[in-house]
């Protein structure tokens, strides 16, 4: 990871790193001794919530960490040394989504995974990938809203494309050839794009699952 001229190098569990980076697309993560590092040495103990939609990852106490704090349309990073760097939210979105995509591509190219028989481990595994896909899709949707670019999403084995034209946002399913229009998104985003945090949070909370 590079922050300004500072490069942080470490060996860690990149799948856990990618998920926690996806979490920080909409949430702050502040360094704390009782929380997992952003690049954990090991991050394989997965604790699922009750409805298997989110996961808390526990690892050993060695790794690399920093704070990620949202400030309007910017993101501020605070390193353990006290060094601070600021980037635009859009830049951060691109970097995080690209990293997560690379990790998932590598994972998918590996041998098929066996779902754990143990219920606790199985729930953790299922919740991990549910949260990953939800946060990845939602991140792409928000980026599409902000840039107007077409974004490709996947959900339950189907492929979707989110785009906008003439002030209307559309969701196209490649398999069913169905198109849905959501004109209300445009008006909501036009109010949120100038930094109104409350409205921006409303946009961020329009999840991919909500509209299907």
Task: For every predicted segment, state its role.
Residues 71-131:
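Mixed-charge, glycine-accented linear interaction segment located at domain edges/termini
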Residues 3-4, 64-87, 167-188:
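Intrinsically disordered, low-complexity regulatory segments enriched in Ser/Thr/Pro
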Residues 9-34, 166-201:
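Acidic, aromatic-enriched beta-alpha/helix-loop junctions
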Residues 30-45, 106-131, 150-159, 205, ...:
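Short glycine-rich, low-complexity/disordered patches
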Residues 6-8, 84, 159:
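Short, mixed charged/polar active-site loops
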Residues 1, 12-15, 35-62, 145-174:
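Amphipathic, interaction-prone secondary-structure segments
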Residues 130-142, 170-171, 186-212:
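Cysteine-centric segments in proteins
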Residues 6-43, 130-152:
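Negatively charged, low-complexity tracts enriched in Asp/Glu with abundant Ser/Thr
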